[in-house]
């Protein structure tokens, strides 16, 4: 046998051994993992839930409205994916507890949390933001991801570890004019990610962050629904198109997989080349 052929055979054999030893295949990098995804019946959250399920995970989707949960579950189950769902308002302790309990009851534990829920209730000067708006924004966008993580950690520990992905925003690095509380809350998530990564590493739980740029969703529609405004936004990007939810989904799946087993405390920007460093 030629040397090149022998080397190729050895490489393929080693790859097969490595993949077999990890108990997964490249087609199912999240096989038998159990994933919770908050705010996952539309947009980025829905795309993430779909991708995790496509990659082999049992996914529990959630949203504040039962009809949205039912529709998302029906759609994804119709694609042959292992998906269930429950109502969850992440700002309510009883809802967070129910989300965790649902996953444990149906699938026996939790391996993955994707914290995607967020609000943006204000547009205007930071000098005009009321205390009520600050409280609502920070409660949902910062406090809830921290408490949601706290709720899943005991279940992850029972399974030997896990992965948390917190969804921030490009606004954490490049604040959007008029969205003051939202900008601040998303910057805070970078610090939350690093803090959790340090504290949870001894428990074999990795914590990373996704910072989407301008992604075409209903949440961001005021930034792109006008064609002229959309074209103007594209001019600020290195990649001259708006992002799609699916552009974020594969990154999250990677961060939750064994391929990212040596990555924690990091933020991945999916922003089409938008400047993204503090």
Curated annotation (Swiss-Prot):
Gene Ontology process terms (BP): alcohol metabolic process; ketone metabolic process; positive regulation of reactive oxygen species metabolic process; retinal metabolic process; steroid metabolic process
Top-level taxon of origin: Eukaryota
Disulphides: none
GO cellular component assignments: cytosol; endoplasmic reticulum membrane; mitochondrion; nucleus; peroxisomal matrix; peroxisomal membrane; peroxisome
Site residues by UniProt (Responsible for the stereoselective reduction of 3-ketosteroids into 3beta-hydroxysteroids and benzil into R-benzoin): 176, 179
Modified residues annotated as N6-acetyllysine in this record: 92, 105, 216
Residue positions where N6-succinyllysine is found in the record: 92, 216, 227, 234
Active site, UniProt feature: 182
A Pfam family it matches: adh_short_C2
Enzyme class name: oxidoreductase
Enzyme Commission code(s) on record: 1.1.1.184
Peroxisomal targeting signal, short sequence motif: residues: 276-278
GO function term, MF aspect, one: all-trans-retinol dehydrogenase (NADP+) activity
Catalytic activity: a secondary alcohol + NADP(+) = a ketone + NADPH + H(+); 3beta-hydroxy-5beta-pregnane-20-one + NADP(+) = 5beta-pregnan-3,20-dione + NADPH + H(+); 5beta-dihydrotestosterone + NADPH + H(+) = 5beta-androstane-3beta,17beta-diol + NADP(+); 5beta-androstane-3,17-dione + NADPH + H(+) = 3beta-hydroxy-5beta-androstane-17-one + NADP(+)
Positions contributing to substrate binding: 169
Function, in words: NADPH-dependent oxidoreductase which catalyzes the reduction of a variety of compounds bearing carbonyl groups including ketosteroids, alpha-dicarbonyl compounds, aldehydes, aromatic ketones and quinones. Reduces 3-ketosteroids and benzil into 3beta-hydroxysteroids and R-benzoin, respectively, in contrast to the stereoselectivity of non-primate DHRS4s which produce 3alpha-hydroxysteroids and S-benzoin. Diplays low activity toward all-trans-retinal and no activity toward 9-cis-retinal as compared to non-primate mammals.
NCBIfam families: PRK07231.1 (NF005559)
UniProt domain comment: The C-terminus peroxisomal targeting signal tripeptide is important for peroxisomal import. Once in the peroxisome, it is involved in intersubunit interactions. Three specific residues, Ser-176, Phe-179 and Thr-195 are conserved between primates whereas the respective residues are phenylalanine, leucine, and asparagine in the other mammal enzymes. The two residues at positions 176 and 179 are molecular determinants responsible for the stereoselective reduction of 3-ketosteroids and benzil. The presence of an asparagine at position 195 is important for the maintenance of the quaternary structure and stability at cold temperature.
Protein's name according to its UniProt entry: Dehydrogenase/reductase SDR family member 4
Species this chain originates from: Homo sapiens
